[in-house]
Design a protein with these regions (language model features):
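Preference for solvent-exposed, low-hydrophobicity sequence contexts
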Residues: 1-227, 236-257
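Extracellular/virion structural assembly segments
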Residues: 2-4, 16, 172, 191-204, ...
């Protein structure tokens, strides 16, 4: 007489992909048998579900639809150096109970481990290949140093950010604390300045890597950025684990080029639920299309006992207007890897 949970999601997993639990019982032959699944999100009971065996005595439960409706990834506009992105990640677990008998009654139960579900939506092949340890900044992670930030930017190409532009990098961590390091270099690779900022534990953190934000929140100055050609961003777990705990060193080149046209910096949610950015440097076109919705009423009006057709009385009546804004963005020449990245991010 027991429930056994056989399969659970990865410790960190994406909300818009299957979040699957499987479980079985040795009491499935009992009358009126079913499983009762209680889903807990951030420690509170979210919903209760009745599930029936699907493959012999085994059943499954997908928490994706329930948990993804609770998540959001708002654009960060407050110039904080780091943001605890708790709106974009939740901790979930389930309690599975047996229910059977005449009348059916709740019997024994089993509780799953906790899972961190972030506001991601991976393409199916990416989801099948996803391993949370490739992104976990933690001293308990044997894959450190070098784990990845939550972006698919092609690492063989240069990422650019202007002095007055915004750029964000996100990471997951199950460590107890970590720090963020910024290093500025000149055009021949000489270190100009370095600064570390220590932070307490967050499950999902977004670093605002914008030059203005860095200058506001660290000892790095405008003069340092004026002398720099690029800078590196690295985060490192500083907990009690035995491994290095460091992420990759993400290199950002400072875009000081004079552009003929007004540039447009586009920000969008990537597949991990974190903001990616790209600057379009050629001429952009804004347009607005106005659409009207209306009806034709019967012509003519009554004038006493006569029905007349005055010039002032129209037939076409508009009751609503809508405007659709369109922005056509044009890039300068870009590398094929970057072009493919943009197509995958924005169109597919």
């Amino acid at each position: 007489m027991a429930v056994t949970i056989q399969q659970e999601p990865q410790f960190f997993t994406s909300a818009s992909n299957p979040v699957i639990y499987t479980f079985e019982s040795d009491e499935t032959t009992q009358a009126n048998f079913s499983y009762i699944v209680e889903l807990y999100i951030d420690g509170a009971l979210h919903s209760t579900h009745q599930v029936f065996p699907q493959s012999a005595e085994v059943a499954k439960f997908n928490a994706s639809e329930a948990v993804r409706s609770t998540l959001a990834s708002p654009l960060i506009t407050n110039f904080s150096l780091t943001t605890n992105y708790d709106t974009a990640i939740s901790t979930i677990y389930i309690i599975v109970s047996e229910k059977y008998g005449t009348p059916p009654a709740i019997q024994l139960d089993a509780t799953s481990n906790a899972t961190f579900v972030f506001n991601g939506a991976l393409r199916h092949p990416d989801w099948l290949d996803f391993s949370w340890k490739d992104y976990n900044v933690s001293t308990t992670n044997i894959l450190t140093p070098g784990v990845l930030f939550l972006t698919s930017w092609p690492r063989t190409r240069k990422a650019f950010c202007g002095l007055n532009e915004r750029m964000f990098l996100g990471f997951i961590s199950n460590d107890t604390s970590f720090d963020v390091r910024f290093q500025l270099f000149d055009s021949i690779g000489n270190l100009i300045v370095s600064d570390n900022v220590g932070l307490t534990f967050n499950d999902l953190t977004v670093v605002d890597c914008s030059p203005v934000t860095i200058m506001t929140n660290t000892t790095i100055t405008a003069g340092n950025f004026a002398a720099a050609a690029y800078y590196k961003v690295r985060v490192r777990g500083t907990g009690v684990g035995i491994f290095n705990g460091s992420s990759e060193e993400f290199i950002i080149y400072i875009d000081n080029e004079c552009h003929r046209y007004e540039t447009r910096r586009l920000h969008w949610l990537n597949k991990f639920g974190v903001w990616d950015s790209f600057t379009f440097t050629l001429v952009s076109t804004d347009s607005t299309k106005v659409s009207s919705t209306g009806y034709n009423r019967e012509s003519g009006v009554w004038d006493g006992t006569s029905y007349t057709y005055p010039l002032y009385q129209g037939q076409a009546t508009t009751y609503a207007k809508t405007a659709k804004d369109t922005l056509i963005l044009n890039s300068d020449w870009i590398n094929e890897e970057v072009q493919k990245w943009l197509v995958r991010e924005l169109y597919e």
